[in-house]
Each structure stands twice: as C-alpha cells, then as structure tokens.
C-alpha cells in the first residue's frame, strides 16, 4: 500500500469553498466543497460525495469513508468544521474471530461497505487526510493487481458485524455512476498531482528516459550503486529484443553451441543486431569505433582481434552501460572511478584459440569452446531460463536460475585466478562439456509446510466398564452440563459484563478465592452464555481475550499476548504496549467492546507495577470499550501488594469464591455421576467430608475419586470381584493423595535403609547439629544393629546404602571421594522420618 500524507507530517488548514446553505433548525451551515491547504503551497479541493482517508489509530492504515455532508456547527464556540460520512472497513478492522467468514484472503486494496448504524458517522474535518479513489466491483469481478491499482481501493462486499454480503444494487449502481462521472475523477487527479514532491517527479522522468534508451535486460543489470524504483525484471534474448553492448564480445561458436535449435540465417541476423551499439548522448572524450570496425560489425563478421594492437571500446558511464558479464569486470582496472580504455580486455581471443580453430576447420571436428566461451554459454542459458520463467511462471525454473547464478559466480572466481598466457598454453587440458543439466537436490524440509495435528488412524475407544466411564466424567477437563453451587456468583458476573456491554463503557472486576473453587470455570460459562446472546442480538457483539500469568515467561509479555489475540500482529513488549495504549486510550468511534480475562493476576506483579496499572487504567478512559476480569487466589491482594494508585483504579467491584462445603462437593460428584452407578453412597459422603475439612478444593476431590476407580480395577485384577468403589478404596486413595512422597518412599525402603535413617537421627540428637560425617553415622548404625540383634553391614555396604538414599533425594551427601569424612544431611524433617518409621 502507498504511504499516505499522514506520514509526511505536513500541516493542513481547511477552508470552506462557496456560499453556505443555512439550516436554521439545526443551527448549521451546509457546504458542498472544502479546500485543504498544505504548508508547501498546494491545495486539494474535496466535494461532498468523494471518498476520503481519515486519521485513525494506525497511520499506515487510515480509515476510509465517503463524505455525505459538510457543515459548520454554529451551536459550538468556536464553530467547528464537521462532516457526516459513510464508513468503510478494512479486513484488519474486522474481529479476528469473524475473519474466517470471508472464506478467502483478500488483497490489501479491498475494503468493505459498513452496513451498520451503531458507529458515530460525525467526524471533525481536520481529521481528513485527503481524497482517495474507490472503485466498486461486482462480487464475481477480480481485483486487478497491477502497479496502477496500488493507490486505488476496491469494494465488492458489505459487512454487517455478522457476515459478508454483496453490495446492495442501489449502492453498487450509485458508486459506479459516480466512478464513471468525469467530475469526480479529473479534478481529483489534477489536485493530487500538485501534492507530489518535485524530487519524485524528476526521478520518474529519469527512469522513463533510461527505459527508452536501454533495453529491459540492461536496465535490470544496473549496478547496485544506482537505485531506480520500479525496475522491471523482464528479460528477452536476441530476437525478443535483447541488446548487447560494444564492449562485450560474444563468440559466434559459443552461440552455435548454446542455441543450436535456431536457424543459421536468424542467428546471424540476431548477432548483427546485438553487436550494434545503442544510442547514447554525446559525451566529451568519448572514443568512437573506427570505420573498419563498423564495417565488420555491419557485415556480421566476428573476426578475432589481436591482443596487442586491438582496443576494446568502453562507455564513459559504467552505471548505465556496464553489464554483469564478468570478463571485463575482472580484468579491466578502474582509475578515478572510470574504467581504463587502453587495457586489453579479457574477452580478446588468444593465439592458441585461433590455432585450435584453424585445426578444427581443417579436420572438420566439432567446435570446442574455452572456459571463457563456456562462461558465455552458461550466461546465455541463464537468460533463456529467465525468459522461460517469466513466460511460464514456473517455480522450478527459478530454482535452476539460482543454480546457474552460483555456477557463474564460481566461473568468475576461476577466471580471475587464471595464470598468464604462456602458463595457460602449457596447462591446457581437453574438457568434455556436461550433457546432462545439473539438478539441485530438493531440501528435505519443505519451505511452505503447514503445521497440523496428526490424524487419528483408529477411532476413540468407548469405555468398556462403568469405572472407565466414571473416570472420563470425573476428569477436571470434562465440561459439565451445568455448574452447581455457583448460581449466585454466575449471576453477579453475568450482570456486570452485560451491563457494561449494553452501556458501551468499560470496567474492572476482581475475583478471588482459593484454588479449586470454580472461579475460572464460572467466568468461562458466563462468556459462553454472552456469546450465545450476542449471536441472537440480545447484547452487542464483543471480542473475548484470555491470558494466564502462569503461561508467561515475563510479566510484560502479557502485552504481546493481548495484541496477538486481538489483531493477530506480533510485536515486542514495548511496542505492543504502545499499540494497545493507542487503541484503548484513543477516541475512535468504531470500536468493538473487548472482554479481557486475566487469570493468575498475582504473577503479573513487577517492582514498578506498571503492568497492573495499565490493565486497570485502560478501562477508565472514555471510549476504551474494555472490560477486564481479573482472577487471583488472594482475597486482600490489592491491599497487600498493590500501590494506592493501582488499587484505586481496580475499583470496588470485587467477588470472593468461598471454599466448597461437604454438601456442595457431594452435589458436584452426584451431578457428574448422574445415571451412572460406580460409587457407594458412603464412599461419596466420606470423600466429600475429607476434602471439605482439609481444603474444599473440588479438583482434589475429583482426582481422589478417579484414583479410587483405578485402585478398584487393580483389586479386580488381583482376583477380587468387580464391584463398586468402596470406602476402603477411597481411604487408600486419600492416603496416597495427602501423604508426602518422601514418607511413602521411607515406608517402602528396606530394613537396612530404615536402620541407617535411625542412626542419622540418633547422631543428630547426640551432637546437637543437623549435619554429621559418614564415620560418625556408621558408628551409630553399628550400635543400633547390635542392640536389635541384627547383623551389621560392612563399611562398603553402608556406603552403598547412603548413596542410594542420596540418589532418592532423601539425603544430601557430598561426593564419595571424601570417603569417611563426607558430610550427610537430611532432606526432610526429622518429624516426617520418625512418622514414617513408627510401627503401626
């Protein structure tokens, strides 16, 4: 897309054109035209009915609208110049969740007629950037992609916040009638022409002059020190219009080898045309070819010149006449920015090549070219492949072109390092040209691979028993039909978000509660119900964005996640914060309300607390249309860790989720296991009371029940009869869930290992320290074994026991190279060790 006038940072002044049309009822003066003056002296006249660009949040993508009215509001002091417009929307302005409804990827020039009346169509005239051309197309017409249409916008469909639809017939007819009218097109072009900078016009004229004096292939081969915009990449060869320069020598024999499919007469005619010098302006100190040379060129003769007496003519301007044929570039020196015209060229035919040519003509052998001629043939093949690539548009030809480029560069390096003529004549070898073209191996990794989830080969197996069905229903990721025991909290959150959506304002709500009390699940259910209401037009449409502090590597990355989910853009944290601040703090009228859910808010705490401050400050701005729902585990988090300026912006709308009671946990389990007989009633009552007394965490209750079903299945495999989950199964599961893994490991350890742990505690109590050497612990271990009548192990066996307990992280030990003096510590508390070692 072109860069609009907003990027030039010019100052604009607006003035009315013509007499006003008074409107006494509304205290307004209507106008038909307005003049926009720029500080460089140019003027742009804009009339009612034209399409204009309006300043927006993104200077690169301004808003597009059609002027309906131009008026001056006399009720305000001072009077303001205003306009009433019909909005268009770009594809990037449509919510990300609705873009898939288009079914295709639109070009950047396509806009959509906004067919809704909820946006404010009254704007300030000073926000107008300038006129723009908009072309209306039928839905079946194709948008052109040529260079002339880059500054033109096209409209084919309309957008009504729900779906894309073709333009109404009356709208399409009016737009096309306006497009065909010369009143809107010619003045527009004339005015915009004055706005363009003279430097750009001069550059365009120079480019046109260059293109007229040179062929397209020469223009493409311009050196890198001259940058010309809009350079064409077309390449034609010989009869197609390719011209060569007089300083480039091409062997007629190499042309025969590379283009043997053409006729001899056509080849001679093409060669005579290519050797003719192009038209160039007269320059001082320019060397002109002799008449003998001109006669030879006209007759189509390509006799070799003598290296000592002949001089290759070169142009004075290397920027416009030098090609990429690397012989002259590598062998001719450069003095004071100009190539020397008296240095022999690398393209001169050596003596041994002429002798070889005479011998081949005598014996009528096939013509063999040297390395320089092979390079010429390679370059000729390269141009042929480029021409075929432009004509056919085949991607494989482009890959072959790259291989030829690399091969020609290797040839350039080889030629630049060639020895002198005498040494070259001595080391000359016969080389057989390769007949099969070189093929590039295809990369193993595809360039345009689309990541996707692997397809399932087999269907999902149905649960084979009631216990498997119960495990599926009791999983924390299973979505229930309803959320029991949270009806009041659901209604409060729903009413808060619904009121903000209907009023078009923003706000914050802080939700707190211990883990597993249904905070996130309740908010998800509220959003799901609101989205269903938005589809039936009960509430205005909105965008839903969710971020979780646990999934962020750094608190400032929350800006990146929000921007990516809102617009699909990727940016750094600082840039994303600026874009979001511009979006939520701007005065745009065509914004859709955004509902932002921030889970694990306490993990977004920073030293300056700027992340929390911005999240709570954005909804307070007028026109932000942002609703923030924050979730944390601490009830008094705002008072404990937040500054006053942060907690005051959070507001007083807070909600606390209390832990579940045993009756509520029982109701949750019964609702999940509805119409399924897998648990005894006493077992459900037991687990509900146990969990309610400890934490009230519903997730922990579901996990205990799932583990109990697994224990029940294992007992059936050992020979017991398959029955319902009993109290014994649940007690075993509760012991596993609430007991420490260290205690379980100590209980399942061997007798020698348990005796070694008792020796460690005995030594700690004797010395009064929580650290001892292996020698001290070993003496205590031997004494305990004698008291209990057990055979005490040797020093090596005790060292192996110590190492094994250290590998289990029950002990913290030094490396074994310290031997008897290595220090040992407990990695668990002494009370836990004594609790695990007590006899039941």
UniProtKB/Swiss-Prot annotation:
Protein name (Swiss-Prot/TrEMBL): Origin recognition complex subunit 1
Q: What is the role of the protein in this entry?
A: Component of the origin recognition complex (ORC) that binds origins of replication. DNA-binding is ATP-dependent. The specific DNA sequences that define origins of replication have not been identified yet. ORC is required to assemble the pre-replication complex necessary to initiate DNA replication.
Q: Where is the BAH domain?
A: 44-170
Where does the record place Acidic residues bias? 392-414
Q: Give the originating organism.
A: Mus musculus (Mouse)
Spell out the InterPro entries in the cross-references.
AAA+_ATPase (IPR003593), AAA_lid_10 (IPR041083), ATPase_AAA_core (IPR003959), BAH_dom (IPR001025), BAH_sf (IPR043151), Cdc6_C (IPR015163), ORC1/CDC6 (IPR050311), P-loop_NTPase (IPR027417)
Region ranges (Necessary and sufficient for ORC complex assembly): 480-840
| Annotated GO CC locations | chromosome, telomeric region; nuclear origin of replication recognition complex; nucleoplasm; nucleus
Q: Where in the cell is it found?
A: Nucleus
Q: Which UniProt keywords apply?
A: ATP-binding, DNA replication, DNA-binding, Magnesium, Metal-binding, Nucleotide-binding, Nucleus, Phosphoprotein
What post-translational modification does the entry describe?
Answer: Phosphorylated during mitosis.
Disulfide bond among keywords = no
Q: How does it assemble?
A: Component of ORC, a complex composed of at least 6 subunits: ORC1, ORC2, ORC3, ORC4, ORC5 and ORC6. ORC is regulated in a cell-cycle dependent manner. It is sequentially assembled at the exit from anaphase of mitosis and disassembled as cells enter S phase. Interacts with CDC6 and KAT7/HBO1. Interacts with LRWD1 predominantly during the G1 phase and with less affinity during mitosis, when phosphorylated.
* Segments of skewed composition (Polar residues): 418-439
Q: Does the keyword Metal-binding apply?
A: yes
Which lineage is the organism of this entry classified under, starting from the top rank?
Eukaryota, Metazoa, Chordata, Craniata, Vertebrata
* Residues modified as Phosphoserine: 197, 255, 258, 276, 291, 332
Q: What is known of its domains?
A: The BAH domain mediates binding to dimethylated histone H4 'Lys-20' (H4K20me2), which is enriched at replication origins.
Biological processes per GO annotation? DNA replication; DNA replication initiation
Q: Where is this site: Histone H4K20me2 binding?
A: 93
């Amino acid at each position: 897309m072109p860069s609009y006038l907003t990027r030039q940072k010019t100052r604009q002044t607006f003035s009315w054109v013509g007499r006003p049309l008074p409107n006494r009822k509304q205290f307004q003066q209507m106008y038909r035209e307005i003049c926009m003056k720029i500080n460089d002296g140019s003027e742009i006249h804009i009339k009612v009915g034209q399409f204009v660009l309006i300043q927006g949040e993104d200077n690169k993508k301004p808003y597009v609208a059609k002027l309906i009215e131009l008026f001056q509001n006399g009720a305000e002091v001072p009077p303001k110049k205003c306009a009433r417009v019909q909005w268009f929307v770009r594809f990037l302005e449509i919510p990300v969740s609705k873009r898939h409804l288009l079914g295709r990827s639109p070009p950047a020039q396509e806009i959509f007629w906004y067919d809704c009346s909820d946006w404010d169509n009254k704007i300030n005239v000073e926000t107008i950037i300038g006129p723009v051309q908009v072309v209306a197309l039928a839905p079946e017409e194709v948008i052109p992609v040529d260079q002339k249409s880059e500054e033109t916008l096209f409209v084919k469909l309309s957008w009504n916040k729900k779906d894309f639809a073709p333009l109404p017939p009356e709208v399409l007819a009016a737009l096309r009638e306006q497009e065909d009218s010369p009143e809107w097109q010619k003045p527009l072009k004339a005015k915009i022409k004055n706005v363009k900078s003279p430097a750009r016009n001069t550059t365009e004229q120079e480019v046109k002059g260059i293109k007229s004096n040179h062929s397209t292939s020469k223009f493409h081969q311009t050196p890198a020190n001259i940058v010309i915009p809009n350079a064409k990449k077309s390449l034609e060869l010989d009869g197609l219009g390719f011209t060569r320069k007089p300083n480039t020598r091409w062997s007629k024999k190499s042309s025969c080898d590379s283009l043997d499919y053409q006729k001899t007469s056509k080849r001679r005619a093409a060669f005579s045309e290519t050797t003719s010098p192009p038209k160039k302006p007269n320059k001082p100190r320019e060397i002109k070819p002799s008449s003998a040379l001109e006669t030879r060129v006209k007759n189509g003769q390509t006799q070799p010149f003598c290296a000592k007496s002949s001089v290759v003519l070169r142009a004075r301007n290397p920027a416009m006449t030098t090609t990429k044929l690397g012989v002259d570039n590598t062998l001719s020196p450069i003095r004071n920015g100009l190539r020397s015209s008296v240095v022999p060229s690398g393209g001169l035919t050596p003596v041994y090549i002429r002798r070889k040519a005479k011998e081949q003509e005598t014996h009528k052998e096939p013509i063999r070219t040297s390395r320089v001629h092979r390079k010429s043939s390679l370059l000729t093949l390269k141009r042929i492949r480029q021409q075929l690539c432009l004509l056919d548009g085949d991607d494989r030809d482009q890959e072959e072109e790259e291989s030829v480029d690399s091969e020609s560069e290797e040839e350039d390096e080889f030629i630049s390092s060639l020895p002198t003529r005498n040494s070259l004549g001595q080391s000359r070898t016969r080389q057989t040209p390769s007949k099969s073209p070189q093929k590039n191996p295809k990369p193993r990794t595809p360039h345009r691979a689309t990541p996707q989830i692997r397809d399932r080969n087999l269907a999902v197996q149905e649960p084979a028993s009631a216990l498997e069905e119960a495990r599926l229903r009791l999983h924390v990721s299973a979505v229930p039909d309803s959320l029991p025991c949270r009806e009041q909290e659901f209604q409060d959150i729903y009413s808060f978000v619904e009121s903000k959506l209907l009023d078009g304002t923003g706000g914050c709500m802080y939700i707190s509660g211990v883990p597993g009390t249904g905070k996130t699940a309740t908010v998800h259910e509220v959003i799901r119900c609101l989205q269903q209401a938005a589809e039936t037009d009960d509430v205005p449409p909105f965008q839903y964005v969710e971020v979780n502090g646990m999934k962020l590597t750094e608190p400032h990355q929350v800006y990146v996640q929000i921007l990516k989910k809102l617009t699909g853009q990727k940016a750094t944290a600082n840039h994303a914060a600026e874009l979001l601040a511009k979006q939520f703090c701007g005065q745009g009228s065509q914004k859709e309300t955004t509902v932002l859910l921030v889970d694990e808010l306490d993990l977004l705490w920073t030293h300056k607390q700027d992340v929390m401050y911005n999240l709570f400050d954005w909804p307070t701005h007028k026109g932000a249309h942002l609703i923030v729902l924050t979730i944390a585990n601490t009830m008094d988090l705002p008072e404990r860790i937040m500054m006053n300026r942060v907690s005051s912006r959070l507001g007083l709308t807070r909600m606390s989720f209390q832990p579940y009671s045993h009756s509520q946990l029982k109701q949750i389990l019964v609702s999940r296991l509805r119409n399924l007989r897998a648990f005894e009633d006493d077992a459900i009552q037991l687990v509900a009371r146990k969990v309610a007394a400890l934490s009230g965490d519903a997730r922990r209750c579901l996990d205990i029940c799932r583990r109990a079903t697994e224990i029940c299945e294992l007992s059936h495999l050992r020979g017991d009869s398959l029955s319902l989950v009993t109290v014994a199964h649940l007690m075993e599961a509760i012991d596993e869930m609430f007991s420490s893994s260290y205690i379980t490991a100590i209980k399942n350890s061997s007798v020698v290992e348990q005796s070694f742990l008792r020796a460690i505690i005995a030594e700690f109590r004797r010395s009064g320290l929580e650290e001892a050497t292996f020698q001290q612990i070993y003496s205590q271990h031997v004494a305990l074994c004698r008291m209990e009548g057990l055979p005490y192990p040797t020093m090596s066996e005790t060292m192996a026991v110590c190492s094994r307990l250290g590998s289990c992280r029950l002990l913290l030990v030094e490396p074994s190279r310290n031997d008897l003096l290595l220090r040992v510590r407990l990695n668990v508390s002494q009370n836990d060790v004594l609790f695990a070692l007590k006899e039941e």
